[in-house]
């Protein structure tokens, strides 16, 4: 895991690092949901459409088109990362400390901090605003990311607070954490949504930075636990958007037994601006989602190989 220290259980006023709390989500589990996005990830998928969630540290995101050149950020920056030269605003990320002072003084949206330290109480105060919607729609709260398992102690405490309020819970995870982490989460989770991104182990390591052995082992444990679960695969052009790869994953998922359904998630190009804002390389710049006919073909393969209901999103 890259970045700041993860809060430990028992420390005074435990805090987690959260990138966003999205209300009225319809895609992160059943019913109307609030999705809490944890910052930090233990994988490095080259196609990630949320690159701001990879590091657990709060980070500055820069959107030059929103800048009006007022200079307020220059005055606020103590590191000298922001200067005005020949009437033009310049930013040197190499000396930036991501303290957030410039963003606090920017009112145009040119400078935005991604990631905020929050207590369980602070997160719950936002969640509880919509508890009536959860109850009436069969919804609840989903912990996502980044990767929820990179802040396990905070996740457990938040899940406990949710269950104390009789709110349905779900997690979205890559399943790459040690099984002991999931054992600590499972008593407070009603639904597990996990990814199997690539079936071939060497290809998985090439594209995500890690082997998939632990992921497949954890998937079997989730299935054997009896906990409700579903499986997703992001369909990435040039990586796994072919019948062989999707077929292999689907066959494995079907063999686990008990999955509610299998979902193919088409590549999302909307993260390109985030790479620019972070000033980091985007290996999938210009990539577009699999075309409709290709997606339909993969859907049929997934249905045939898994024996499960298949959704495409």
Regions found by a protein language model. Name each.
Residues 29-30, 37, 50, 54-55, ...:
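N-terminal-biased segments
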Residues 7-30, 235-313:
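Auxiliary Fe-S-binding modules of radical SAM enzymes
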């Amino acid at each position: 895991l890259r970045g700041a220290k993860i809060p430990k259980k028992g420390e005074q006023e435990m805090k987690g690092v959260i990138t966003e709390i999205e209300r009225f989500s319809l895609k992160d589990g059943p019913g109307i949901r609030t999705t809490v996005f944890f910052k930090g990830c233990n994988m490095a998928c080259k196609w990630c459409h949320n690159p701001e969630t990879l590091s657990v540290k709060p980070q500055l995101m820069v959107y030059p088109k929103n800048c009006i050149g007022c200079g307020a950020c220059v005055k606020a920056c103590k590191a000298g990362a922001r200067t005005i030269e020949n009437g033009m605003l310049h930013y040197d990320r190499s000396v930036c400390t991501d303290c957030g002072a410039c963003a606090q003084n920017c009112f145009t949206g040119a400078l935005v901090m991604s990631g905020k330290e929050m207590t369980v109480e602070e997160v719950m105060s936002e969640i509880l605003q919509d508890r009536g919607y959860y109850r009436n729609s069969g919804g609840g709260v989903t912990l996502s990311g980044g990767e929820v398992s990179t802040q396990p102690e905070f996740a457990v405490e938040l899940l406990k607070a949710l269950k104390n309020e009789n709110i349905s819970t779900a997690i979205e995870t890559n399943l790459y954490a040690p099984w002991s982490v999931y054992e600590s989460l499972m008593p407070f989770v009603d639904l597990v949504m996990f990814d199997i991104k690539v079936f071939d182990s060497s290809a998985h390591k090439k594209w995500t930075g890690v082997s998939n052995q632990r992921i497949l082992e954890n998937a079997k444990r989730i299935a054997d636990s009896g906990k409700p679960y579903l499986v997703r695969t992001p369909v990435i052009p040039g990586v796994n958007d072919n019948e062989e790869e999707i077929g292999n994953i689907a066959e494995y998922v079907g063999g686990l037994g008990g999955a509610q359904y299998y979902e193919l998630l088409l590549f999302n190009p909307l993260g390109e601006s985030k790479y620019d804002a972070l000033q980091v390389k985007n290996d999938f710049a210009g990539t577009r989602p699999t075309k409709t006919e290709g997606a339909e073909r993969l859907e049929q393969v997934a249905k045939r190989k898994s024996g499960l209901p298949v959704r495409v999103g």
